[in-house]
C-alpha cells in the first residue's frame, strides 16, 4: 500500500478526522471509529510501518510504553474491569489496516471479543466526548 492511501498516515498528517487523545513526536493515540467498548483506543507510529516486522526496536518500545499509559488511563476513565491490548500482523492474523497499530480495549466481566468488522461505527460526537475525558487524564 502506498502511504498516500493509508488512512492512518492521513490521520497522522491531519488529512482525515480522528478523536486524538495523545500525541508526541513519534506516536499518535486516537479513539477507534468502530469501538469494541467506549474508550477503545488505537496507538500508531506517525511514520508508516506496515507491521511489527518492519518497525525499529526503540519505536516499538515507545509505542508499548504509551500503550501501557493509555491502558491505565482508559481503565480509570471507563471503569472497565480489564484491558485487552491487541496488535495484529498480516492478513492471516486479522490485520485490516496495514499501518502498525495497537488496540487498547476496555473490557468487562463476561464479555466476549467480537470481530472488529462486526462493530458499527461510533458517532464523531461520541468519540470526541470520550477523547476529551481521556485527554484530560494524559495531562495529569
Label every model-predicted segment:
Residues 1-140:
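HIT superfamily nucleotide-processing domains
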